[in-house]
Curated annotation (Swiss-Prot):
Source species of the chain: Staphylococcus epidermidis (strain ATCC 12228 / FDA PCI 1200)
Residues reported in the UniProt entry to bind ATP: G39, A40, S41, G42, S43, G44, K45, T46
Higher taxonomy: Bacteria, Bacillati, Bacillota, Bacilli, Bacillales
Main function: Part of the ABC transporter complex hrt involved in hemin import. Responsible for energy coupling to the transport system.
Name used for this protein in its record: Putative hemin import ATP-binding protein HrtA
All residue ranges annotated as the ABC transporter domain in the record: 3-222
SMART domains, alphabetized: AAA (SM00382)
Gene name of the record: hrtA
Subunit structure: The complex is composed of two ATP-binding proteins (HrtA), two transmembrane proteins (HrtB) and a solute-binding protein.
Entry GO CC: plasma membrane
PROSITE patterns: ABC_TRANSPORTER_2
Enzyme nomenclature, EC number: 7.6.2.-
Keywords for this protein: ATP-binding, Cell membrane, Membrane, Nucleotide-binding, Translocase, Transport
InterPro entries hit by this protein: AAA+_ATPase, ABC_transporter-like_ATP-bd, ABC_transpr_LolD-like, MacB-like_ATP-bd, P-loop_NTPase
Membrane topology according to the record: Peripheral membrane protein
Length: 222
């Protein structure tokens, strides 16, 4: 059924100092579809992604997934983020004192997996990206591209239904950026997830099924 964004608006401030950052945003994303959000700085992209991830409340409107408000699927938004949504950020944000394997198993156990289940899932994911030999390595022992690949697999650890990526290649060179986005797309397609990524890099547009342009808080095209 996919994800339906319905009339999402977001206003910051009060009374005379109000600023409307998002204005009646409407679009849909099908299961297995990978879209890119694009627009100038200040167009509302990150605000929208933050609302979709349950990190910020909208002023009005709703986000519907499988016929039900996304924000009512769990008792609180923390459970939503842990179980249904995988986040990938500009920086990998790996925990410096945790080994690669533990970066993933920690997330799995927080979602209710047993240690055995979490280890098996983590090893499966890390093998997919060719890091099975680095399970006991620390983040500083990996390249920037390897760290971001671990961050992607961490986002997929709990079988999320929705993957949200905010400029995940901003700190990578062109070849690494393409490799990372191709990996994100491949996982979204293979697992029929919903993928939404923000990027300014037009060379990455070819990986998207569709580009959604934002301009001044509104959808310019979808």
């Amino acid at each position: 059924m996919g994800l339906v964004v319905k009339d999402i608006s977001k206003t910051f401030g009060e009374k005379s100092s109000k600023t409307e950052v998002l204005k009646d945003i409407n679009f849909e994303v099908k299961d297995g579809e990978f879209i890119i959000l694009n627009g100038a700085s200040g167009s509302g992209k990150t605000t929208l992604l933050t609302i979709l991830g349950g990190l910020l409340s909208q002023t009005s409107g709703d986000v519907v997934y499988e016929g039900k408000s996304l924000f009512e699927r769990h008792t609180n938004k923390a459970h939503l983020r842990l179980n249904d949504i995988g986040f990938i950020f500009q920086a990998s944000h790996l925990v410096p004192y945790l080994k690669v394997l533990d970066q993933l198993t920690l997330i799995g156990k927080e979602a209710g997996m047993s240690s055995k289940e979490a280890q098996a899932r983590a090893k499966e994911l890390l093998t997919k990206i060719g890091l099975e030999e680095q399970l006991n390595s620390y983040p500083h022992m990996l390249s920037g591209g390897q760290q971001q690949r671990v961050a992607i697999m961490r986002a997929l650890m709990n079988h999320p239904k929705i993957v949200l990526a905010d400029e995940p290649t901003a700190s990578l060179d062109a070849s690494r950026a393409q490799e990372v986005v191709e990996m994100i797309r491949k996982q979204i397609k293979a697992n029929q997830m919903i993928g939404i990524m923000i990027t300014h890099d037009e060379s990455l547009f070819k990986y998207a099924d569709r580009i959604v342009q934002l301009y001044d808080g509104k959808i310019k095209n979808s």
